[in-house]
């Protein structure tokens, strides 16, 4: 997926409740959700090198902990530069938990990239095999909208409450972010159904009088 979708996913994970366990959770999850794409720095050594190593080690199960170390180290540096201040003094950073969260966010990146038609190599360097679900284009406006709304809707309601003088009730941010993540899973379910139906339709056809040896269907922006 494109970077903004990954950032939004990490932010929703934090707002869904993980930020209640430790300070700096949402920041860590947001950065870690996009951290595997640091492999784009390989393009500095040339386009061929960058292409060959994209979605390689940083997108593998073996690379997730290393990605997490980089992110948590960066967040730790920010924390130090800010004088070790956090929003809630009663909720200090729990670095071992932040590392775990960073790993979860890294896995979310692999999962999102697995759903599109480019795929991932999660078992690299032990296997160069690519795996892809082929149900989502690299940018899906509906999925993107779910995640974005899950983050901004609570803020809009808060502004309305302040404008009319109403008292805010309940953890709107947590509910909205959780609903956004659930909506993404439901969208995947629908897209999987549509993908299977498209593949079945292709397999049912004959080509020059012969049955297809293999049929595949790939989403794009105009026809997800």
Where are these regions (language model features)?
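N-terminal membrane-targeting hydrophobic helices
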Residues: 1-197, 201-213
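Short periplasmic/luminal acceptor-recognition loop of GT-C membrane glycosyltransferases, typified by
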Residues: 216-224
